[in-house]
Swiss-Prot record:
InterPro entries noted in UniProt: Papilloma_E4
Region (Disordered): 16-51
Family designation: Belongs to the papillomaviridae E4 protein family.
Cellular compartments annotated: Host cytoplasm; Host nucleus
The name this protein goes by in its record: Protein E4
Role description: Contributes to multiple aspects of the viral life cycle including viral genome amplification, suppression of suprabasal cell differentiation and egress of newly formed virions. Induces host cell cycle arrest at the G2 phase by associating with and preventing the nuclear entry of host CDK1/cyclin B1 complexes. Inhibits cellular DNA replication by preventing loading of host replication licensing proteins MCM2 and MCM7 onto chromatin. Within the cytoplasm, associates with host kinase SRPK1, a splicing factor regulator, and inhibits its activity.
Length: 91
């Protein structure tokens, strides 16, 4: 049988048999887990205020008005120039 070094010279891929195994790539850091939001469904027997209006609690020159329904939030205020600004978030 031929010498091992002669075989490795003739068949260089045999050298791969003696290489250490490859390390797996480093893992990507995991994203933080989201907290589970528990949605509370309205009970049909409960009374609900379908439309609430609450003035803003922080001091401003022009007060904010916050209105809520079961599926939306609306914030309204006026600029110094008198323009009414309304932001509505639908849930």
């Amino acid at each position: 049988m031929a010498d091992d070094s002669a075989l490795h010279k003739k068949y260089p891929f045999l050298n791969l048999l003696h290489t250490p195994p490859h390390r797996p790539p480093p893992l990507c850091p995991q994203a933080p887990r989201k907290t589970q939001c528990k949605r509370r469904l309205e009970n049909e027997h409960e009374e609900s205020n379908s439309h609430l209006a609450t003035p803003c609690v922080w001091p401003t020159l022009d007060p904010w008005t916050v209105e809520t329904t079961t599926s939306s939030l609306t914030i309204t205020t006026s600029t110094k120039e008198g323009t009414t600004v309304t932001v509505q978030l639908r849930l």
